[in-house]
């Protein structure tokens, strides 16, 4: 997967450079890096059904909150960013993103109360493009921002018992397909070299289930056979609203 991902990056870079020469704007374009913060909403239907069931058990002292959002960072490369003479901005890019959310609770076993946590993480490699319009020298409108995402989702359950810690880890299939689409604003700090970018949009993501190292699914009706209705939901049923703020740094190709 990563090999094909890198090959695609090279193809985009070469073709974008050729386009720059064809259209003949003042500079042949910029490459650069960026980093920022991401807020992501999602509907973890199956996971939250499991949590609701667990919170109803008699030994629950402090219930675990349900999962509906995560925060984290993204770092990436603008493989090519150029502004045409008519003000249109075109960018080809790739990035890595890490998001996480950790919810805690307490369960009572005998005379002791034990801390319990669930840590949900989203890691993805993405390739994308955007088209914008520079309507002033300082502010540009990112008309359309799109990316294809290859996601890896994991869940870690941790229970702290007296004298020991029990950890159960589950992972999704590798490279679960998803996509993001949005719009935003770019504010130039130093024209073409440094800018601040804000983006809002929607991210599509569906994860059927996650599995431990033995291949046992997390959403398994054997775990709670007396109430297996929660297994009707996918682990992550859908994505949702996404917001990103990032700092871009560019360097001229020539």
How does the language model describe each region?
Residues 1-6, 21:
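Positively charged n-region of N-terminal signal peptides that target proteins for export
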Residues 21-31, 84-92, 125, 137-144, ...:
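Outer-envelope beta-barrel architecture signal
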Residues 38-71, 97-124, 148-178, 205-244:
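Extracellular/periplasm-exposed beta-strand and loop segments of Gram-negative cell-envelope proteins
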Residues 4-15:
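Sec-dependent N-terminal signal peptides
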Residues 16-20:
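Sec/Tat signal peptide C-region and signal peptidase I cleavage site
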Residues 37, 73-82, 94-96, 127-133, ...:
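Residues on the lipid-exposed face of transmembrane beta-strands in outer-membrane beta-barrel proteins
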Residues 190-214:
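Intrinsically disordered, low-complexity segments enriched in Gly and acidic/Ser/Thr residues
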